[in-house]
Each structure stands twice: as C-alpha cells, then as structure tokens.
Amino acid sequence: MDAELYRTSGQMIKLSDALIWFRNRELDALGLTSSQFEVVRYLLLHIGEEVTAGVLMRELGLSQSTVAGILKRLCDKCIIDRRQDESDTRRSFVRLTPKGLALEEELQGIALRSEDVLLRGMTEAEAADFYRLLSLALSNMNSVRDEAREA
C-alpha cells in the first residue's frame, strides 16, 4: 500500500477529528456537542429567516436522521423551538429561544479559540491560503456529493 495515496484525506480526517474533539471539550460546559453547535451557529446567522430541517440538512451537509436527532436534543434543552408552517402542516420552522440566543457570546468565544489553535504558527497570508484551499477542497467534495444526489 502506497502511503502517499492516502496522505491528504488521512490528514483531513485527523484534522476533522481533532477539531471536533477540541470543540466538544469546549462545549461540554454548555451541554452541547460540535454538531449541535453548528445548528445553533447557523440559526444565529439566519435570525428572522424561515429555517426548516430541510434547509439545515442542505446547508450543513447532514442526513435527515442526524438533523432530526440534533433538533430533538436542542428542543429538549429549550435552545430551539419549532413552529408548524400554517400553509403546510408537514413542515415546521426552527428558531432559537431566548436561551439559545443567549449562547451567542459564549459560542463566538469557542469559535475564536478553535480558530486560534487551528491557525497557530501560520502567518496571515498562510492562514488566508489555508482557508482558500480548504474552501476549494470542500467545494470539490460538495460538487461530487451534489452530483450523486441528482443521479
């Protein structure tokens, strides 16, 4: 087996695991997980918009069952609530509760600490290149995923 063939994806998996571990450790005091953080972050960035489970699935790249579980746990913690769409009772909108909105400052602090650790030792130019390359790699992988969904 040629280790060079697996180097990039192996490093990406290790980086993802390390980042999730770091964020879960930081989020433990709030009773949240990294996946729950992503949903709350998305809702904080889209206050006033009609966000559904389907939107969260699409925008966060998560499965229906994963989103359903996250939303149930966030509802149980009174961080979000769900309001049924009056024109389509099969659909519900998700929004942050006052308790969820109150998490914004703490979550921003965790995001900044994560970013600081992730970019430690990089110059501003290297950090910008790193972000640009990560965005390109993610776009490449998302295009393959989107093509598979359409097939």
Q: Where are each of the predicted segments found?
A:
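N-terminal helix-turn-helix DNA-binding core of bacterial DNA-binding proteins
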Residues: 22-66, 146-149
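C-terminal regulatory/oligomerization modules of transcriptional regulators
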Residues: 1, 125-151
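Pre-recognition alpha-helix immediately N-terminal to the DNA-recognition helix
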Residues: 11, 38-42, 102, 129
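Alpha-helical linker/hinge and terminal dimerization helices associated
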Residues: 15, 19, 60, 103-119, ...
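Short, locally clustered residues in the helix-turn-helix/winged-helix DNA-binding domain
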Residues: 13, 41-48, 108, 135
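N-terminal leader segment of winged-helix/HTH proteins
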Residues: 1-30, 77
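Charged, amphipathic alpha-helical coiled-coil/dimerization segments
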Residues: 72-135
